[in-house]
Design a protein with these regions (language model features):
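Conserved AMP-binding/adenylate-forming
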Residues: 55, 95-99, 103-233, 239-242, ...
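Conserved C-terminal "lid"/linker of ANL adenylate-forming enzymes
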Residues: 271-272, 288-289, 308-359
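Short, well-ordered beta-strand segments
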Residues: 5-8, 193, 290
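AMP-binding/adenylate-forming catalytic core of the ANL superfamily
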Residues: 196, 201-202, 224-314
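Conserved acidic residues
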Residues: 4, 51-53, 120, 223, ...
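Short catalytic-loop micro-motif centered on adjacent basic/acidic residues
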Residues: 7-8, 32-34, 121-124, 244-245
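Conserved AMP-binding/adenylation subdomain of ANL enzymes
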Residues: 1-5, 12-105
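Amphipathic alpha-helical segments in well-structured domains
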Residues: 40, 167, 207, 211, ...
Length: 359
């Protein structure tokens, strides 16, 4: 039996870590290494000392790892960077159809050495993942099993089985799990419903919420998505986050935020202005982006130009019309997802529409 060592870094009260970081490894007879800190030096030591082969994490942590690696790559002398890029290109060519961690370790040994030299698979879930980030790690020889699930469905509903790797989906339903798309629109997008033994029986002491969430044995997830021609599930956003324009177009903030991903700020979030201020309108603006700058950072022309350049990539009806500088850290869940409703309420109570600057 192959030796497996799982690194657990998420809070143990989070469903994905409990299932993927503990129950799953124990069933496989694997070793579990649980860290109570995300300090880089401790994480690096764990990779090397315990020969970590698998790791579960949420998209925000994966994104931070990507930023760290890109920063290290940018520090390389020109000749070494050129050589690294060619090796990455070769690895991409040789592993296009199927991952080969052993081959990738030979080609990109120094990169893999930074992760202990034994890492085979990253498992990510708990929020929407940026396909570009998933592809970045796959191209380095670290396959990312991107999945979708809810605590109400025992964590996992679909998982990408990596045969072949696809960065744009959350995979196919797991065995024994049925998934339907309810009331699809013209593009096939509708609410995702789940049925199977993995679905919870009820919410504790909340029969009304249970009745709203489980209908005829189907769990209504509140997430929107569609199946592609290969049977892979693709997510669009949260039903309650969806914005309907005056022209009848559906907009998902998560799609817009993908375009702004990599913006050099601490964090950001896209809202509909009339969601934050229900009785007010900000000129003709439908959307705005709330920005939390890094400590000591100033909003300058470089950042403004970056915002505008990204905004121009969007279709006209999806473009952000203004921005707001927010001085407090965004509230987050245990899986590090932004609490949109709580943040919107805070902005609505403590900021005036005059704080919105036009783009």
């Amino acid at each position: 039996m192959l030796f497996r060592s799982y690194l657990s870094i998420l809070p143990t009260n989070h469903a994905i870590d409990f299932m993927v970081g503990f129950i799953g490894p124990f069933v496989c007879g694997a070793c579990v290494v649980h860290l109570r800190t995300l300090r880089p030096e401790y994480v690096r030591d764990a990779f090397v000392r315990y020969r970590i082969t698998h790791m579960s994490l949420v998209p925000m942590v994966l994104k931070n790892l990507e930023r760290g690696l890109r920063a290290k790559f940018d520090e390389l002398p020109n000749r070494r960077r050129w050589m690294l890029d060619r090796l990455i290109d070769l690895n991409k060519l040789l592993t296009k159809r199927r991952a080969n961690p052993g081959l990738s370790r030979m080609l990109l040994g120094q990169v893999h050495k930074a992760f202990g030299g034994h890492l085979n698979t990253l498992i990510v879930g708990g929020a929407f993942s940026d396909p570009k980030t998933l592809q970045f790690f796959y191209d380095l020889g670290f396959p990312v099993a991107n999945g979708y699930g809810l605590t109400e469905a025992c964590t996992a509903i679909t998982v990408n089985n990596l045969r072949p790797f696809r960065a744009d989906t959350v995979g196919k339903p797991l065995p024994g799990v049925e998934v339907r798309v309810l009331n699809p629109n013209d593009e096939g997008v509708g609410e995702i419903a789940v049925h199977g033994k993995n679905v919870m029986s009820h919410y504790l002491d909340d029969p009304e919420l249970t009745a709203e969430t489980i209908v005829d044995g189907w769990l209504l997830t509140g997430d929107l998505g569609h199946f592609d021609t290969d049977g892979h599930l693709q997510l669009s956003g949260r039903k309650k986050n969806m914005i309907v324009t005056e022209g009848g177009k559906n907009i998902y903030p998560e799609d817009i935020e993908m375009v702004f991903d990599g913006l050099p700020v601490k964090e950001f979030c896209v809202f509909a202005a009339n969601y934050v201020w229900p009785d007010k309108r900000i000129g003709n603006e439908t959307l705005f982006i709330a920005l939390r700058l890094d400590p000591g950072q100033r909003f300058d022309d470089v950042l403004m130009n970056d915002l505008n350049a990204r905004n121009r990539r969007l279709a006209d009806y999806k473009r952000v019309g203004g921005y707001l500088i927010w001085e407090k850290d965004f509230p987050r869940t245990a899986s590090l997802k932004i609490k949109r409703t709580e943040l919107a309420q805070d902005i609505g109570l403590n900021a005036d529409r005059a704080a919105i600057a036009s783009l």
